[in-house]
Amino acid sequence: MKIIIVGIGKVGYAIAEQMTGENHDLVVIDRNSAVLDHVDSMLDVMCVEGNGASASALLEAGVREADLLIAVSENDEVNLICCLMAKKLGAKHTVARVRNPEYFRDAPILRREIGLDMIINPENAAAQEISRILRVPSAFSVETFASGLVELIGFQTEEGDSLVGKSLIDYNRENPNSILMCAAKRGEEVIVPNGSFVPQTGDRVYVIGTPAETTRVLRSMGRAMAPIRRVSILGGSRIAQYLAWVLTDVGTHVTIVEKDEAKCLTLAEKLPKVTVIHGDGTNHDLLESEGIFHCDAFIAVTDRDEENLLMALTAKRYGVKKVVPKMSRMGYLDIVNLTGLDTVISPKAIIASQISSYVRGLANSQGSAVESLHYILGGAIEAVEFTATSATHFLDRPLSDLHFRNGLLVAAIVHNGRMEIPNGHSQIHAGDRVIVVAKKLFLQDLNDILG
């Protein structure tokens, strides 16, 4: 596919990196020549210097032949104008980054009037992911599929866990049809496990099942499942605002610490149920006097990765049971892993996976639709949700009759609203949702899983 990206900041670069990795024909537009020089040296892309909302820059980028234009500059208005111009000039599909909550609430109108095909909001996406993790505090990652019927959770195994020290065949024999372990990381090795895999203490693993089953399994291993009732947020960013809306709606007490007084006043006006504290979030005297660490979860979402990491570690030292820092620089992830923090949020990585899911769906509009896509274990594994259609080649056949590609699992099937952990007798029918977990095979169609 020919894809144009307007705006090469953190989000734009992450999307460009993902799209070039999936072998798309990519053009990037930005006003900053230094940024373009860097992108040109790192990625296989064509660069156009200019205003992405101008017809001249869009035409130079080949907008008339573009299958998709993605506008992700720092300015919402520029992104919207860019998509409007691109559609008028012939782009088949357009995606705009919209961060302002007021615009984001008007998404249906924008789609209809401007012809937008998709609106992305990294801050809202990050807030939604944090809220899912807080619902299962003993997990470091929680992803959902099939409108919430299926849950993929990541956690670190501990000594004494029922999963540890026995093969998955033996575990599944003792716990039939409950969950499926579908990915693991041991040291630097990433594994899509088969039945002979034996989990060890300290493995980072992912299991899939219904929300009720994944919760039951974690509880049976003694994991803390008490609800999160008090949350402290460092930084009055848009992520903080979106997250506060979600949490206060379910009765969670939220405190936000922000050092910019004007921003505090705005937050206090928009979030009447939230306690907003004006002050430096790195000032320990302030944090102690205000009881910021007397909470069930501490979320650090300032604009500085270093501050987020430092204060997350401080919160952990104070005994906060769930700590989540936001990281923009993926290079920091190795450092984070060494600190013992198990959960990190990266808005740009979340958006890159959303865009990848959308692009794969466009590229295969006649086949089995890609409904959602999540990258796990640092992007080494992808979990893809498909809808089986009449174009699927192996409908109504037992899975034991099929030969699948290496490094791949059919992890779950949803039929008529019921989730099944598949076995050799299971069959896929038209209309079923199928979740596939694989090492990065860039699956675009359900038929791609066959060897």
Residues covered by each model-derived region:
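Cytosolic regulatory regions of ion transport systems
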Residues: M1-G451
